[in-house]
Amino acid sequence: MKYETKVLTTKYQKPDAYGALSMPVYLTAAFEFPDAKAMSDAFCGRSMAPSYARIANPTVTYLEERVRQITGAASVTALNTGMAAIAYALTAVSGAGLNIVASKHLFGNSVSLIRDTLGSFGVEPRFVDFTKPEEVEAQIDDKTAALFFEIITNPQLFVADIKKLSEIAHSKGLPLIADTTIVPFPAFHAGDFGVDIEVVSSTKYISGGGTGLGGLLIDYGRFDWSQSPSPALQSRTKKVGKKLAFTARVKTELVTNLGSLMTPQVAYMETLGLDTLAIRFRRQAGSALWLAQQCQALPEIKRVNYTGLEDNPFYELSKAQFGSLPGAVFTIDLESKEAAWAFIDKLQIIRRATNLFDRKSLAIHPASTIFGLFTPEQCAEMSVPGTTVRLSIGLEAREDLLEDIKQAVK
């Protein structure tokens, strides 16, 4: 079944009492029970009834179930940001004395999360180039908790061989955790490439309008967590089984104790976003490819970076994994940082904003914003030069966007 049909025919196990075609927004902090036993059953996990809105909400559960059916996952947890999804995933698998082997080409806050936040909890960060599988494998030891990377890095747009990474991870008894935000699940099926845990900033493509923050934590339910060096996960396997330990820890410990469940308002907006996701993705990614091709002819632009371009070093690998439309983001390099800033300042249609995959096209200077707290030397190590401008392409007419780019580079 095609995505466009599948997404519109997924059915929730508990339909609305009034037969509403759209799931209602349950704006409530608490839920009433018919008797003391029903209340106890909900709080102790003997029933699926929501106990308190910090832990579960019917509107949020509806979004989780729809994504689970669409992706074929075992479970989905909807959180209030993409960073929360990453933080929960890495916290769930790690612990003091363990290490995480992560890509050195990550989003700036992901780097800080692993290096600073998890590092302060006693987790050792090991950053390496994930486009070089042999270097990844060399960093693994018996204290490694997981491998973590972005399927296409932001903003470098590097592409790793996902199946090769999966083979390495599984040969060592490790889970492969992937941030798939830049290419959504209508175009890329992470489970088919051996990804065990998928994290998505649903703020981006799924929301589509830049109206709400959200993150999805998707567990494909295939990894044997009894192999994990984490005592917390080993303990969970004895209670819920080898394949459910991760989700059990996320839902019954991390969500309950730390909060961060997605709000029902955002969950409602994202269920609507799912319905049109495939259509919007094809339009936006198609425009990105066309614009990247046109920008190659502009002499003021020194380099155009998009993995869908045939002269891109990652073109063949990108096409094999993501097809001919690997997302709606590309970057351009100008003569200098000053030229990059001047270009951004002159834009008239493309907005100056930090989000990705909004319906509106957006531009940002990564080195001075999302990587602005890193030193120039650190930015260079992460391949984020000051000459780069990142463009996220929206739904505007591509011809108008090209004219905007042309006038801004002059």
Where are these regions (language model features)?
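Short Gly/aromatic-enriched secondary-structure transition segments
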Residues: 40-46, 347, 405-408
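PLP-dependent enzyme catalytic core of the Aspartate aminotransferase-like
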Residues: 1, 97, 115-116, 121-124, ...
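Conserved C-terminal alpha-helix-loop-beta "cap" of PLP-dependent enzymes
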Residues: 289, 295, 300-389, 393
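Conserved N-terminal alpha-helix of the aminotransferase class I/II PLP-enzyme fold
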Residues: 30, 35-87, 109-117
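Conserved PLP-enzyme active-site core in the AAT-like
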Residues: 7-13, 75-297
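Glycine-rich beta-alpha junction loops
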Residues: 12-14, 27-33, 204, 221-222, ...
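Short conserved active-site loop signatures built around small residues
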Residues: 1-26, 217
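Short amphipathic alpha-helical segments
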Residues: 48, 74, 213, 266-270, ...
